[in-house]
């Protein structure tokens, strides 16, 4: 298992990557994207994979790594030097560094070494270039230890750095062969020995081999130190003959090899691993000794590989179970890696490769029982970094790809042990294939301590960063930072930087380029940590702009050539700490996102500020083209030098097949001042005439000062374009420039260090003279695409204010005291009618202190009102836009002044609300103490009802019914026609007026029965319009006469001569719910029940039918004239005078006698019956 060369995109189709000037800029500051210098190389060589700016005595260069140079067979890789600033464009030159990168005394394998995939400059001169897949051969194995070349300033390889510089196959191997008679054919054993020995590097300082053969007895074929080369051992092995024997004394053979073959007398070396390979084809005859013999081997740390040949068992068709168990017991643990079985002698050659690999895997560790690699697959140089004292080399393949960091200082090399970077808090997360050393860096704390930082992006699947310190050559872990998302490759790129240039590290940036966004694309994220003492604390995270991916729904419309390529941005694939680009005194950060824009790529520039960077990027530089010929722009970045001699840091950006050098543009500092004469507007002191009117004129002096940030002492001449806007806070200006009657003027000016110009303007006759007049000047460079850029830390707009002179005596501020009084036409309840829908509010505003400038009343009102006008002040004093603002007084309301006016409203029939709500306030631009503000506000809320305009009609088909004197009552009623006359009642409701028709309830009442229960009006039918839902209290045709049911009349029900009086009749009611409609109609059919009237005594009477209408909406009411309707049906009887009842006659006679007696009594009392004249005559 080997890691990818980086968490960066791979190779695309072969094409030339020409970074022509087809770069477009989304957000621009001072990195010039239109005049870049480009370098091109073969895409298949991954030219542009790494870039570094470089300078030596010969000049300035861009170094470009091309790790696959030598395609397709010999991909050794290399570094190109590309000249900069030579006047004419010169080609890049390959340095051929791999040729001179070498380690003595090993068999080197430089194919596929990917030299140039790591490239860093040495702060003391020269640079370091690495090939992490550099390998050397040990036997038949290739160990990819990796290598780095320390290159001098003159491009000469000074020395090569590699953690392992020789084959460390220090093994003493004794092969114990079963030579008994059952082994057949012996040639197969000889072939097995030949193939196995060919794979070994045999020599006094490498592997030594001895062979022991046993059967009934044990023979030493040759000792460990007998031969000093592989060739000699191969010759000797071919001469070995089968010794034979009827017994297989396996325990004897193993024990003899332990006691004798591994002695110093026979060539065994102290401290060298002991390996025994036992080959046998049958169960031992001394197996009772095996357990002790094997334990003795264990005690002496002899690694044992056992091989069981099953040929004799298979030929004899015998069970192998017991034999296999015995041979397994001989093998070391774990058994599955140390035990082999083959079907017969001929099959021995099939296990040679696997056996050889497992034997030589023992060389990679000092652990006698281990069979894994330590530094043999380390890929040292996968990353590199120069700290203050040490060179840090990432070795991601070390310790079975757990990884490590090799530390080098001069001739001292520290290779940490496998457990060095295991911290207590993370032991529960086993670091399997963590790739520690994927990227390395260092930081300087404020205390002066140097902190070393390494990333392991596969740790616990989420990634981790380790911060440690070197103490007397030992590593002490201080802190770990963990990623948050599985597979994000957190820690695959690290960068530290000193933002404020105080020589102390301020922030650490950790890239997670495969961080998945919301749409499951590899968006990428960069985490920013601030250094506090010796600990890093999370500060913020950075993300790219949103990218659109090739989803299943839009797969056919994607422009990406290979739609199976990763989608997103991979923001954070490269992070570079660059020197101050914008000349603001703070260093900056550049981050690459090589998969943006369909793999075209882009980079983001973040400016420093204080001790960190700003979260929003200052400039984004995307790659140009269609994403097919331009790939992965931003996969490498470097920006440390001024390469064109203008004193500005330039930025080099690499992509697949090329790189571009972007020049920084100088930053122009432009300062603008504006002065005015007079500096205040006094509307009472006119000083000029404009358009035939006296007004106030003002002269403005505008001055420009310019300089360059990089050359502050040099005189700089700038061509500027500027625009002045008068009263820029107002939509309608209160001033115009003289001679143009416009509020804006635009001019060009050339400024050499400093320059001034003049403009004049005048004030218009406007009501608002409280707020100051703001004058705005906007400026820019005449040619913003070339030359310096404006300093983005300074505004390119200047605002100055001209205040108005105040009528406040000697005080600078006017302190007013406004009061508001409000009166309305109604206070308790408003009844709104169509003919009378007006509502008025009277306002009185008074000021009792200093003049109140721009005094105004603001009226907010509920939606059921519509502003219709004002009275008593000028009509243009009020503006209505959802609320009403009325200016009171001009230009101010003086002390003691009072203004009364009236606001007129109409009701809005579109909004029927239960209340009229009005909020009124009086305010001004002058100040008013909080304690006097209470009388500036009035709230009004009045209940309101709306009188619905409608027409309520009622009519009847019959108003008079006459009953003949000779009419009789039919004994049997067969139909309703036998009953009497039909009366049809009609009700009609029609909308009139502007208010909507509410839901109504119509109640129809008619006399149904006499007080004695005799029918009067008999209901036979009910019909209505569609919007009416009627519910009669009695059923139509309750006696079911129309259905054919016959009915008899009986004189027992009503005796002839009964006097009929309908004032006491019982009434029936029909209720109809009428939904809102312009017209509603209800018809009721009734029949006069003649039998009741024929048998009764009366001459004439009236039957009253009542209709009552009621609104179901509390806000919509009906006028009293539209609530009730009555219909009177007169019934008369021909030929019969009305008969007076006997009780009436008797009562009348009694009343007459009583009255006569009372009259006589009264006359008697007054002496009416006395004769005074008679008495006088008698006297």
UniProtKB/Swiss-Prot annotation:
Gene3D superfamilies: Bicelle-embedded integrin alpha(iib) transmembrane segment, Integrin alpha, N-terminal, Integrin domains. Chain A, domain 2, ntegrin, alpha v. Chain A, domain 3, ntegrin, alpha v. Chain A, domain 4, von Willebrand factor, type A domain. Disulfide bonds join 82-92, 688-697, 703-756, 808-814, 878-886, 1030-1062, 1065-1072. Keywords: Calcium, Cell adhesion, Disulfide bond, Glycoprotein, Integrin, Magnesium, Membrane, Metal-binding, Receptor, Repeat, Signal, Transmembrane, Transmembrane helix. It is found in: Membrane. The keyword Calcium applies. It is a single-pass type I membrane protein. The keyword Heme does not apply. Ca(2+) 1 binds at residues 498, 500, 502, 506. GO terms for biological process: cell adhesion mediated by integrin; cell-cell adhesion; cell-matrix adhesion; cellular extravasation; integrin-mediated signaling pathway; negative regulation of cell population proliferation; negative regulation of epidermal growth factor receptor signaling pathway; neuron projection morphogenesis. This is Integrin alpha-1. The lineage of its organism: Eukaryota, Metazoa, Chordata, Craniata, Vertebrata.
